[in-house]
């Protein structure tokens, strides 16, 4: 009887451990998968500051290029592509949160004019869906449908991101007019260097917090280092914690200065922003322009015919 109870208790403990591990895995994966949009959405009401700077640059410190391509003009209530390109060397590997090396992820924020929004699925053509792949876009806020975010997603597959955009119709949205509008984009590749709370990630360089001598370097069991520095000013011991990931540059007995790099900078990614312009074109203007061109062409044709007729009359008079 006691053996049966013991077996049941062991079975219960194993089941509980597996359940807890599964829950932690799901939470961790969700946190990693949603990190890029959540960091910006939780910390800022608007991703573009009054200065024009996109807030993602607060966490992604390195400056890298980004490119956006949109049509020169679009008609009301039509779907068009906004193609964002986030170029980088596909051979590069970044430091992951666990200290290991892995591929770079990418993410983007697209700030559209008021009234422009993500196209509904039933308005997207099969060709455009093929370009989009399996990406899932979301709005920055429920009340900001004109600001779209995506990522992080694998950079190997999505260094070029196609956003399906629905142009507004001034006939149904009175605050929208037939004008030229700006579009802003921010794109990152790789992990950030600073978290929104101001703490450093393991994807950045770590500097000394004191001037002195490195007395001892302790390699931590789960990775990373504890660097004990004897402060030159008062002899007290300062401990700098280095997470797993960055490579150590100093050794025991070495003299170091305040703010001297203790590690290499493992960051291979960065953030960039750009802009483009799109004209919301009035169909009546296009019809008027086409009518004008047709009138000019017809006038040219009639002029040529009239000239030929005049030449024939002149020729007949000369013969007479």
UniProtKB/Swiss-Prot annotation:
Any one GO molecular-function label of the UniProt entry: iron ion binding
Superkingdom of this protein's organism: Eukaryota
Residues in the signal sequence: 1-35
Transmembrane spans: 286-305
Any Pfam family: Apocytochr_F_N
InterPro entries assigned to the protein according to its UniProt record, in alphabetical order: Cyt-f_TM, Cyt_f, Cyt_f_lg_dom, Cyt_f_lg_dom_sf, Rudment_hybrid_motif
Key word Transcription regulation present: no
UniProt record, GO biological process: photosynthesis
Residues annotated for heme binding in this entry: 36, 56, 59-60
PROSITE patterns linked: CYTF
Cofactor note: Binds 1 heme group covalently.
Compartments (UniProt record): Plastid, Chloroplast thylakoid membrane
Keyword presence, Chloroplast: yes
Cofactor or coenzyme needed: heme
Protein topology in the membrane: Single-pass membrane protein
Main location: plastid
Subunit-level organization: The 4 large subunits of the cytochrome b6-f complex are cytochrome b6, subunit IV (17 kDa polypeptide, petD), cytochrome f and the Rieske protein, while the 4 small subunits are PetG, PetL, PetM and PetN. The complex functions as a dimer.
Known function: Component of the cytochrome b6-f complex, which mediates electron transfer between photosystem II (PSII) and photosystem I (PSI), cyclic electron flow around PSI, and state transitions.
Family the entry assigns: Belongs to the cytochrome f family.
Protein name: Cytochrome f
Name of the encoding gene: petA
